[in-house]
């Protein structure tokens, strides 16, 4: 398949599809495929409402976010990742991107531009388009994550395409329990969703001189987006991204969802090996700063670089649950206790 065809297929939506938002009908009038300078790929859909309004729907690996324009725009040069703004938002990413393909009715805009993504504790997200240079017009859009069903849209049967993982031989000592292409049904967001394994990563970290390793199975579903099944020493966690502004760190730990999570570990995580497809461009040796906090059965994890900040929450998932979901006869027995493993009540 050609590169152009790959780009055209990197979506689960169709140009011209009709939907509704809060009772107002709209048409998916245009689509722009965008790539960041770090290789991340996403789609921006232009929503043309019948009443003349416009909005855009961001289709990313994490799901869908519906944006409407709103005026809040700090200077690009003044932004740093993790910085809280007077508007109540926190800067979670800044960088440069290129619009690499377009379809349908799309407003004229520079091919290359600078951008910043923001997060708020209220659940709103924002993206700022700073244009190509210092004197460019600045566009600000604020929105919330949505499900396609909320917009009266249905994903197409074919799955979107992601970015090929870096190639390399599989480490001899590495044992894999799921394979790219495996499918399983897991409970997420109060319902059961069928996911497909699209990629696998093997990572390591050194803490107080000791080297630890784990595997991350990247899962994808057209409606739900991306999740991860992370396994270390036979212990599994189902992980999903959360809005960074929902987390407040202090010396005592990290507070999120009304609960205090205790500090567990921090260090520099390194990518050792990968296979399949990933939602981002990866290279063997990539390093991120990590911090983990626990409150059983959950683990909060922060990963950051100079230009990006992400938070995720993992839920301890017994091996038999994973085995049943993916039709595996047997998964390895866990070794020791996981930091967020729930305690088993004593029998009286």
Where is each model-derived feature located?
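Mixed-charge, low-complexity intrinsically disordered regions
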Residues: 1-348
